[in-house]
Amino acid sequence: MTMTERLLEATKEIWDGYNETPFVKGIADGSLDHEKFKYYMIQDYRYLLDYTKVFSIGTAKAKNLDAMRLFAGYTHSILDGEMDIHRAYMTRLGIAKEEAEQTPVALDNLSYTSYMLRVAYEEGEAEVMAAILSCALSYEFIAKKILAEYPAADKHEFYGEWVSGYASDSYHEDNEVLADLMNRLTEDYSEKRKQHLVDIFTACSRYEAAFWDMAWEMRQ
């Protein structure tokens, strides 16, 4: 079993609950109130700014050129790739960049990013990867599960772009690169170190679940 497979197996119960949250269900069937999605977009925009910092710290923590290049590449990819989905929706929702950047970060969001940043600053490259992977892989998991249950969800006039973006082949390929690096970094890890990575990944998976609930309730 690879390290990535172990992480996913350990968090299966948490992940199976993602698509049962009211927010994700609303995206899936197209019924989600646009105000809730607007709130989510702003909070996720703020989240991604710190998420990118975690990748940047990973660049500094990397012990070889391949890992350094990967972390640095993803920093660029998020800022100029994934953020494009957000910018497109922000335009449609009438959200100015200034509004997004000046909106207070919700407590659940702040707790999540603070945890990831602490792991990144205090620990090594594999631990950074464990903190990163839950978000990256779970969005693909959610989008593909939506399509399995609602095959036309990627054609929805409003939420289709969100679903298709995270269910795309290119997003999957990016995730495969991340998972492969995690597996290579941990080939010689002790059981104790591997379990620590499971603990980090599990914590971030729980934070992901809380984020969906936060978005539904529009918590402050």
Task: List where the protein language model places each region.
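Short loop-to-helix capping motifs
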Residues: N64-L65
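Alpha-helical bundle segments that constitute or directly flank the non-heme di-iron/ferroxidase center
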Residues: K12-G17, S31-K61, G81, A130-E140, ...
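Short alpha-helical hairpin
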Residues: L8-L32, Y51, A179-D188
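Active-site-proximal alpha-helical scaffolds that flank and shape metal-associated catalytic sites
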Residues: R6, M68-E173, T202, R206
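Basic/polar N-terminal segments that are highly enriched at the extreme N-terminus
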Residues: M1-E5, E9, Q220
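Acidic, carboxylate-rich catalytic segments that either coordinate divalent cations
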Residues: L197-Q220
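Long amphipathic all-alpha helical oligomerization modules
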Residues: S168-T202
